[in-house]
């Protein structure tokens, strides 16, 4: 019988330290989804390099990680600014020539504008924060990943880039571009040992999108908004990011995973004559 000597997936060395010794760059890693990703990656042994525009939240994440016995460092930069991002990348790569994990988490929901009231300035703002920052960060670190034999890129975008979104078509378009970038980059980088995947969050509590304070009195409706029957939290996104960053997903690339409690699968956007707007969150059961 002919024996086939095909490469096999590497065994998992320590299930409690899935990123042991790997250098992980997390943009927007100070708070919210990025903060949870930074903490969880450090818990699993990664050396976490946090890039954030807010020094206070970046340093707080580093302090939390170090207090728990992890390794992290904060860098202050606006990822919409190419020169700032290049400067931080130079600092990181001078200490760690090879980055194994890159999480492009920077993004924003604001300014939310209906298309008829939008302007070229608002379009550019959406582009800069939701697409340019992702592409620029990837450009800064991808050569080091190739030189080091590969790695994993995880792009955080939105479920609204994976379905129709009537609220703000420009926002939806930028998130769709991020999802497409993830898929296309995966195809071109696979032979370099780099996997690229995206995460599309929805209904997740963050400082940027505060469902808790804006839904006071409506908590009982969450079970109607998401099939899993609850609000999402940054930790929900971080756990999927850990899967995609680690060898658990060694055969997964080019995919965009909705981490949304089932909202994409279970519901769409419908026009409410009573509210005179599109909604996917009914006000009554």
Model-derived features with residue positions:
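Active-site helix of classical SDR
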Residues: 138, 174
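Short, small/polar-rich loop/turn modules that mediate ligand/substrate recognition or access, typified
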Residues: 190, 195, 252-254
